[in-house]
Design a protein with these regions (language model features):
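An acidic/histidine-cluster motif and surrounding catalytic segment
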Residues: 1-89, 93-221
Length: 221
C-alpha cells in the first residue's frame, strides 16, 4: 500500500519522531513535502490566486491554506501516477503499538475490497450512524461530523473528484461534510480509531493557534 505522510520539508524533528513511531508497522512510506502557508500568504497576490475569495475575507488561516494545498498535491499525485488507493497521514500522527496487528489486518481487508469513490476516516471524534454498515468490517457510512486529516484512506476515484473542488480553496482540507457533497464522494468512518493524534494539545501545530482565533469570526459569518 502506498503511504503518504504530509510534512513540511523543513520540519526535520517532526519527521524523525514520525519515522521512529511508525517503524513499528514495518510499512514503507514516503514523506510528501507540504506547503508553508505562512510563507505563501506573505504575498497576498500569490495566495489570492489560489483562494475562492481574498485572504482577508476567506476566514481561512495561512496554515489551513497550506494544509489544503498539501492534501490537494497528494490527490494529484494519486491521480497522475494512477495509484489505486493510498493511506494519507500527517507527521504528528501515529499508530499505537497495541493496535499494530489489528491495523495491518484492517489494511489487508481494505486492499481486498476497496470501497469505490470513498474516503475512510481512521481518526477519533468523528460522528456517524452505526446503522449504516458497509461491506468492510468495522467501517460505517453516513458520516455526520468531525474533522481531521491526519489519517485516512482514499481511492483514486475520490482523489480525482476532490481535485475538481479543492481549488480555488474555499474550505479547510478537513471540512469533510462540505466536501462529500461538493465532490460527490463517500465519507466513511472506521469504528476503531487506528490513527492517533500525537499532538492533542496542539503545542507543535502550525495550524491550531491561528485556527482558534478564527472560530469566532467563522461563527459570525
Amino acid at each position: 500500500m502506498k503511504v503518504f505522510v504530509l510534512s513540511l520539508a523543513s520540519d526535520v524533528k517532526k519527521r524523525a519522531v514520525f519515522e521512529r513511531h511508525f517503524s513499528c508497522t514495518k510499512l514503507s512510506f514516503s514523506f510528501f513535502d507540504g506547503v508553508d502557508g505562512q510563507e505563501l500568504c506573505r504575498k497576498p497576490s500569490a495566495s489570492d490566486k489560489l483562494l475562492y475569495m481574498p485572504l482577508e475575507e476567506s476566514c481561512l488561516t495561512p496554515g489551513e491554506i497550506g494544509c489544503a494545498l498539501g492534501h490537494f498535491a497528494i490527490y494529484r499525485e494519486i491521480v497522475d501516477k494512477n495509484i489505486p488507493f493510498a493511506l494519507v497521514m500527517e507527521d504528528d500522527a501515529y499508530i499505537a503499538q497495541s493496535d499494530v496487528t489489528d491495523f495491518l489486518n484492517f489494511l489487508d481487508a481494505y486492499g481486498d475490497g476497496v470501497p469505490k469513490n470513498s474516503v475512510i476516516l481512521l481518526t477519533s471524534n468523528v460522528q456517524y450512524s452505526p446503522l449504516a454498515r458497509t461491506n468492510l468490517a468495522g467501517v460505517y457510512g453516513c458520516y455526520k461530523s468531525g474533522n481531521g486529516t491526519y489519517g485516512y484512506l482514499i481511492d483514486n476515484e475520490a482523489a480525482r473528484k476532490l481535485m475538481t473542488v479543492v481549488l480555488p480553496i474555499r474550505y479547510e482540507a478537513d471540512f469533510w461534510k462540505g466536501l462529500q457533497y461538493s465532490a460527490g464522494i463517500r465519507i466513511m468512518v472506521c469504528k476503531k480509531s487506528y490513527v492517533r493524534n500525537g499532538d492533542l494539545l496542539y503545542t507543535k501545530s502550525y495550524i491550531a493557534h491561528d485556527r482558534n482565533k478564527m472560530k469566532e469570526l467563522r461563527s459570525d459569518k
